[in-house]
Amino acid sequence: MEIRKSAVAGTLESSDVQIMLSAGNNGIEFELVSDVAKQFGDAIKETITDVLNTYGVTDAAVSVVDKGALDMVIRARAIAVVQRALDIVDTPNWEVL
């Protein structure tokens, strides 16, 4: 699916993650800011990429600011930002969830 508008989900509070999503041109491009990027950066990217793939998003610019979020929080924020960017908040795809 094609991203219709830029979107943000999450906060900059401790134990949360803020994900910003906008249209991209060359696949999925990440910008990750995290104190634990060396240890968990690949896992964070994998979780977000999994959500993007589930919704059929192939081109996106993803900016992530992690403040120690657990995987379930990252996944929930990723789902929220993708639904906002695809403008399907009012009609969620329950099979994806």
From Swiss-Prot:
Location in the cell: Cytoplasm
Cellular component aspect of the GO annotation: cytoplasm
Keywords attached to this entry: Cytoplasm, Phosphoprotein
Pfam families linked: ACP
Sites bearing O-(phosphoribosyl dephospho-coenzyme A)serine, chain numbering: S14
InterPro entries linked to this entry: CitD, Mal_deCO2ase/Cit_lyase_ACP
Main location: cytoplasm
Family assignment from sequence similarity: Belongs to the CitD family.
Subunit structure: Oligomer with a subunit composition of (alpha,beta,gamma)6.
Main function: Covalent carrier of the coenzyme of citrate lyase.
Name by which UniProt lists this protein: Citrate lyase acyl carrier protein
Source species of the chain: Weissella paramesenteroides
Lineage: Bacteria, Bacillati, Bacillota, Bacilli, Lactobacillales
Gene label: citD
